[in-house]
A protein has these predicted regions:
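Short, glycine-/aromatic-enriched active-site segment of Class I SAM-dependent methyltransferases
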Residues: 173-194
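Conserved alpha-helix/loop element of class I SAM-dependent methyltransferases that forms part
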Residues: 49-67
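Class I SAM-dependent methyltransferase SAM/SAH-binding core
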Residues: 70-74, 78-128
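N-terminal auxiliary segments of SAM/dcSAM-dependent transferases
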Residues: 1-28
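Short alpha-helix
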Residues: 195-211
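A short glycine-rich, Lys/Arg-flanked "PGG" loop and its adjoining helix->strand segment in the class I
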Residues: 152-167
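A short acidic, Gly/Pro-enriched loop at the edge of an enzyme's catalytic core
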Residues: 127-138
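Conserved Class I S-adenosyl-L-methionine
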Residues: 216-279
Length: 279
């Protein structure tokens, strides 16, 4: 599929006019003082990956991030993980995302929570990074590769912009051990044309072929499955009670999408891995 066509599909899937207003309206209704908001006040909507904010912190610890590290967050979404990394590890983050609306919301939530001097977001493409070669200490991605068809090119770009000795760290959804079509819709795709899930070992080999050295390769499917099952149930409750949640960006299908993720994980059709690799 042509990159331009896929990009349009991704923007249509995730993009939602008025998203910022919806988030702030619901935040106020739930008692959040916007002028005093903290990063974790928005985590239910801005860290909607499997494992949520806890998984972000786990990854940061796994990567042994250091204060002042320059981090490129590929597929930065609403900026939740970036703000968590800034808050917990004192790093500097540049986030890129294919979805224009996400970047607008990410920058505003970052301003509101007081991290604008340490995290900034712009529209960009993982297949053609604008950063200089050997510029970043860390390239970070959490569940953005499912929408990327040309994964080898993405890995090549990640390798290019990393400094020698830099760290590539990820949490991603891969194909599971059981063959078969996944149940749709899921949070990253309403149609099969948007979902590109490779087997874990194929990804692992491609990372090594790109030049990276493996430090950690970890199947965390079981670790996060039950937790995500609870999260999926809470999605229904948050939709009914007008609290912050992924339904604000994915709409009325959010509950079904998360239920399908649980089903796909339980049946072995998809898996979740974390990895740390060095350049």
């Amino acid at each position: 599929m042509a990159n331009q066509m896929l990009g349009a599909m991704v923007n249509e899937h995730y993009g939602s006019e008025g998203l910022l207003d919806r988030i702030l309206t619901v935040a106020r209704e739930t008692g959040i003082e916007i002028d005093e908001a903290r990063s974790d006040d928005f985590s239910a909507v801005s860290e909607f990956h499997i494992g949520g904010r806890k998984a972000t912190i786990d990854l940061g610890n796994m990567a042994q991030l250091s204060a002042g590290d320059k981090v490129l967050d590929v597929g930065s979404g609403l900026g939740g993980p970036a703000r968590t990394l800034v808050e917990k590890f004192a790093v500097l983050v540049e986030g890129i995302d294919l979805t224009h609306e996400f970047c607008l919301v990410a920058n505003e939530l970052t301003r509101i929570t007081g991290f604008s001097d340490r995290a900034v977001f712009s529209q960009g493409n993982a297949l053609s990074l604008t950063g200089d070669s050997e510029h970043y200490d860390v390239v970070w991605t959490q569940q953005s590769c499912m929408n990327i068809e040309d994964k080898r090119r993405m890995l090549s770009e990640a390798y290019r912009v990393l400094k020698p000795g830099g760290t590539f760290i990820f949490q991603e959804v891969f194909a599971g051990d059981r063959e078969g079509a996944i149940r749709l819709p899921v949070p990253w795709a309403r149609k099969s044309e948007m979902s590109f899930l490779w087997p874990a070992e194929a990804i692992r080999n491609s990372i090594l072929e790109a030049g990276f050295i493996e430090n950690i390769w970890k199947n965390v499917t079981t670790q996060y499955l039950e937790e995500y099952r609870v999260t999926a149930e809470k999605t229904r409750d948050s939709m009914q009670s007008s609290t912050l949640g992924v339904h604000l960006l994915l709409g009325n299908e959010a509950k079904l999408m998360r239920k399908n993720v649980v089903d796909n994980l339980s049946k072995g059709l998809i898996s979740v891995y974390q990895g740390v690799f060095k350049k």
